[in-house]
């Protein structure tokens, strides 16, 4: 009896849930959700979707039901934006792909089967979160369909990178990476990274277009290019992947030596320049993303306040080094145009700051696009926008008329007036249209006030009768015109159609052709080996087979010829070995296995050119052994260094270099600060600053793991006696000569003695028993 009652209860529960699901499915009307009629056009549907999406987005609307409402809006737009799904919904009340009588018969079976699956496999009963809709509601608001990806994500990827996850139902690995994905999404979305999720089961066309043939897959999109993430799914790896998508030249490292050149580039680049002062040696990811979003409008630089030589900048611009400070410079490099300072800068604050300072105070019109932005078309009588245009000749330095025009613009900043200037020799048609009497203004500057009436180029304008010299009378006349214009817009009596501006900053034809060719080759490469590799496999197999047939015989013949030559020349090689054997130094049998085939040690100089390849990007497991020397000790130390390390050159993981102490003392002292047992680095204002002698120091640098081992030479008896004999020398004389002569009266023999124990140190290095000093990052080698 009890079993029968339990069975009836379960049946009643099943029927009740089934009825509720059917009613909820019938209540969903995409037209009502978007608030449009059944005859609405795609433009109306898209407009309504954008309006509702902005209103109900969970990040902006704190209503508890905002997320559910946003999901309904997205589903409604997905149905109505697809003509096939919309037609199916209008005819059968559902957005599926099947039609007609078969579709109507399958609807009841689908509802019951859907309920059956949810009942037996829902996580609320058995905790198996295989259904993606039940598994993670956070993915719902990031779901992409093909039209949304093509029309919105790809164009938007030219302003910000996108991180997209490909998932599916019954994906165990997808469940495994969910916690990491949630954490990364929450972090990167706040920084401005676009997020997307593609369900491979429902959006097969989009998944195939992206080249994702397995789940889970994570990829990045920037500038329309797709890059796959091929590393362990952890937070740090995903963050580095997004950072690697960005171009490397977005932010320039600014120091006390180059900040004047950086800020003075506004005239050539026609852009404001932004500087961020911060205490971290690495550029923040938020700042890089901002630089990518506004790369067409501003130039970005970064100042690490912990670097030597930045004190002058911090004093000059009154920077608080204990909090991040953002400055924007326009035409004047001595004083920033705007400043913000905050310990925790948010993306919205930075975006508002950058948007308010996107253009120079009196920007130069270099393209038609910039003309549209600075001088927009009038939308109504209340939204009039006037442009005051200075027509002047191009000069290498700022001319007096332009400086006067700039000072006038600074003193008369208004929302309805924008000040710009044009180089008459570069935009001759544009300037000729605004100057009715070109001969009267030949070689002189002129000022015109204009208002755009439509996008076709129609403008009304007024040109000042006399040339612009920048005098006080000229400023007074221009100010009178602007005051009169507020009361009587009919002052602009002349009318004309302006020609389109020539793009002055566009690359020349050959460069454009080269860039287009590179992009085309890159797209072809991606389409062959990335997106459509499965379809291209037969063709690739055919090509490689043909190449093997054509060149196989040639390669075999070449190897046979070389083997014949080797068989015919053993006596010559024996004679050569006897000759070289006389010149090579003798070594013990114990070290004979380490002796390379070369009869010399290859030692390269560590400079700013070889710094990246020989250290920063050194392969894992490889080390660079660097000798510190000066110009006066170079010959003697290199000879002794080569003799000491010769027996260790048989290892392919060791590289040998030398560093000039005269050129890169600051770099060396920065590294030695991380050595726990190293002597303290003196202050640069100390009178004994330049007396410290680092010649003979040897550093074993591991570029991949960012650590180094230190060899410090021990003073020999001869060296101590030589130094003692110099103690009576006048200290001022010693200071004057110490820069070029680090040791007084030391011959080459005591200098070579500094490296007498280097071979023992090298053996300990290979054993791994030396102390390691880790550093956060490799400093730049200036």
Curated annotation (Swiss-Prot):
Principal location class: endoplasmic reticulum
Organism of origin: Pongo abelii (Sumatran orangutan)
Glycosylation sites noted in the Swiss-Prot or TrEMBL record: 631
Function noted in UniProt: Plays an important role in regulating the size of autophagosomes during the formation process.
Annotated J domain residues: 29-93
Transmembrane segment boundaries: 536-556
Localization terms from the record: Endoplasmic reticulum membrane
Domain Thioredoxin as annotated: residue spans: 119-247
Extracellular face residues: 557-782
Entry membrane topology: Single-pass type IV membrane protein
Record's protein name: DnaJ homolog subfamily C member 16
GO cellular component, one term: endoplasmic reticulum membrane
């Amino acid at each position: 009896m009890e079993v029968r009652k339990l069975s009836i209860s379960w049946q009643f529960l099943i029927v009740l849930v089934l009825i509720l699901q059917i009613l909820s499915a019938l209540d969903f009307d995409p037209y009502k959700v978007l608030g449009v009629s059944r005859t609405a056009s795609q433009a109306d549907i898209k407009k309504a979707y954008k309006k509702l999406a902005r209103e109900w987005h969970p990040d902006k609307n704190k209503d508890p039901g905002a997320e559910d409402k946003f999901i309904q809006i997205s589903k409604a737009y997905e149905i109505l934006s697809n003509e096939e799904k919309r037609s199916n919904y209008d005819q059968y009340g559902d957005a599926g792909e099947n039609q007609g009588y078969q579709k109507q018969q399958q609807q009841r079976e689908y509802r019951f089967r859907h309920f059956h699956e949810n009942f037996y496999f829902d996580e609320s009963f058995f905790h198996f979160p295989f259904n993606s809709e039940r598994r993670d509601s956070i993915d719902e608001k990031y779901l992409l369909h093909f039209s949304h990806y093509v029309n919105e994500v790809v164009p938007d990827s030219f302003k910000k990178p996108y991180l997209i996850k490909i998932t599916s139902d019954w994906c165990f690995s997808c469940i495994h990476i969910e916690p990491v994905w949630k954490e990364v999404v929450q972090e990167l979305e706040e920084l401005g990274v676009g997020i997307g999720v593609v369900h491979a089961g429902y959006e097969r066309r989009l998944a195939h277009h992206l080249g994702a043939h397995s789940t889970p897959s994570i990829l990045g999109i920037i500038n329309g290019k797709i890059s796959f993430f091929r590393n362990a799914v952890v937070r740090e790896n995903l963050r580095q992947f997004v950072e690697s998508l960005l171009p490397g030249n977005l932010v320039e490292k600014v120091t006390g030596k180059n900040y004047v050149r950086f800020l003075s580039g506004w005239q050539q680049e026609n852009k404001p320049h932004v500087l961020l002062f911060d205490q971290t040696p690495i550029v923040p990811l938020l700042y890089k993303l901002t630089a990518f979003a506004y790369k067409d409008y501003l130039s970005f630089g970064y100042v690490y306040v912990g670097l030597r030589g930045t004190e002058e900048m911090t004093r000059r611009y009154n920077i608080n080094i204990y909090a991040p400070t953002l400055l924007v410079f326009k035409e004047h490099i001595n004083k920033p145009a705007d400043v913000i300072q905050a310990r925790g800068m948010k993306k919205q604050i930075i975006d508002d700051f950058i948007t308010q300072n996107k253009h120079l105070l009196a920007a130069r019109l270099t393209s038609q696009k910039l003309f549209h932005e600075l001088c927009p078309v009038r939308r109504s009588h209340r939204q009039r926008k006037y442009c005051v245009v200075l027509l002047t000749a191009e000069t290498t330095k700022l001319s007096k008329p332009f400086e006067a025009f700039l000072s006038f613009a600074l003193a008369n900043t208004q929302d309805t007036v924008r000040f710009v200037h044009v180089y008459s020799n570069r935009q001759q048609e544009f300037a000729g249209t605004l100057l009715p009497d070109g001969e009267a203004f030949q070689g002189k500057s002129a000022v015109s006030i204009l208002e755009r009436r439509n996008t076709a180029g129609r403008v009304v304008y007024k040109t000042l009768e006399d040339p612009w010299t920048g005098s006080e009378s000229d400023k007074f006349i221009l100010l009178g015109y602007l005051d009169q214009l507020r009361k009587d817009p009919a002052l602009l009596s002349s009318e004309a159609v302006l020609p389109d501006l020539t793009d002055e900053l566009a690359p020349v034809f050959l460069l454009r052709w080269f860039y287009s060719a590179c992009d085309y080759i890159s797209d072809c490469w991606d389409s062959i080996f990335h997106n459509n590799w499965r379809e291209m496999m037969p063709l690739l197999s055919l090509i490689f087979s043909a190449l093997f047939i054509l060149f196989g015989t040639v390669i075999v013949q070449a190897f046979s010829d070389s083997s014949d030559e080797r068989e015919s020349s053993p006596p010559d090689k024996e004679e050569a070995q006897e000759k070289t054997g006389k010149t090579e130094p003798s070594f013990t049998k114990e070290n004979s296995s380490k002796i390379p085939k070369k009869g010399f040690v290859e030692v390269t100089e560590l400079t700013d050119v070889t710094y990246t390849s020989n250290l920063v990007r050194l392969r894992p497991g490889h080390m660079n052994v660097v000798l510190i020397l000066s110009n006066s000790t170079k010959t003697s130390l290199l000879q002794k260094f080569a003799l000491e390390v010769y027996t260790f050159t048989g290892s392919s993981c060791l590289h040998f270099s030398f560093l000039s102490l005269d050129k890169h003392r600051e770099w060396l002292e920065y590294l030695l600060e991380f050595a726990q047992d190293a002597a303290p680095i003196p202050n640069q204002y100390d009178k004994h600053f330049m007396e410290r002698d680092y010649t003979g120091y040897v550093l074993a640098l591991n570029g991949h793991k960012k650590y180094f081992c230190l060899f410090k030479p021990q003073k020999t008896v001869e060296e101590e006696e030589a130094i003692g004999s110099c103690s009576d020398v006048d200290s001022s004389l010693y200071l004057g000569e110490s820069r070029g002569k680090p040791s007084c009266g030391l011959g080459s023999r005591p200098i070579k003695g500094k490296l007498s124990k280097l071979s023992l140190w090298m053996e300990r290095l290979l054993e791994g028993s030396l102390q390691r000093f880790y550093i956060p990052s490799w400093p730049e080698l200036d």
